[in-house]
């Protein structure tokens, strides 16, 4: 779900089974939606298709992500994992609180360095943890230029049978592993933030395998389904 200038008037989404289809519809390779889709479709196993939604400006010209999610829900329920181009923590917080009441999961990322400070509670991971939110799942990326890393994560595990994996200990195609100190590793885990790093010689998504509020992800997915 992102801001873009594609689709027809009043058209809020389209389904795609490849990025080639998106290029045919006018998307370019530097757009958020394309990059997110490319990360998703690059994984193995690969998802069959995705819903690409559109965030439309409100009458005053502002963008309200919760309203955008509601509008998307009003026209299609053929999605479960929500990924957005929201940047501000306030938007991420609002999305997470709304999705908590829905049959869906919100997967987000952040490069806020405060997440690496064990004493800091103002980063988005700490905020969602404090609210005990069970339908949100977060990923920390040190490199601020990386667009939608969570899409690779969702793409890798979304098609798996619930309970067959913990959403960690696997490589994610299109992402570059980052280095973390043991202290940073521990801090991120304590905040239920996941991260892409090296374990020995292998690139791997690591973390607590918990949702924002602290419960195991596979438990939450099992309860929802």
What spans do the regions from the language model cover?
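Surface-exposed assembly/interface segments
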Residues: 1-225
């Amino acid at each position: 779900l992102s801001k873009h200038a594609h689709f027809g008037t009043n058209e809020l989404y389209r389904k795609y089974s490849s990025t080639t289809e998106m290029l045919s519809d006018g998307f370019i390779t530097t757009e958020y939606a394309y990059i997110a889709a490319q990360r998703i479709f690059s994984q193995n196993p690969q998802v069959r298709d995705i819903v690409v939604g559109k965030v439309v400006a409100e009458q005053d010209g502002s963008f309200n992500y919760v309203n955008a999610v509601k509008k998307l829900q009003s026209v299609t329920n053929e999605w479960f994992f929500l990924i957005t181009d929201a940047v501000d923590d306030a938007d991420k917080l609002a999305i997470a609180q709304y999705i908590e009441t829905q049959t869906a999961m919100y997967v987000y990322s952040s490069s806020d360095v405060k997440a690496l400070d064990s004493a800091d509670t103002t980063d988005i991971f700490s905020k969602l943890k404090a609210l005990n939110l069970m339908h949100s799942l977060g990923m920390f990326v040190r490199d601020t230029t990386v667009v939608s890393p969570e899409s690779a994560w969702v793409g890798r595990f979304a098609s798996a049978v619930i309970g067959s994996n913990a959403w960690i200990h696997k490589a994610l195609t299109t992402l570059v592993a980052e280095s973390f100190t043991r202290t940073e590793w521990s801090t991120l885990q304590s905040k239920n933030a996941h991260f892409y790093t090296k374990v020995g010689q292998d690139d791997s998504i690591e973390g607590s395998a918990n949702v924002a509020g602290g419960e195991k992800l596979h438990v939450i997915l099992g309860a929802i389904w």
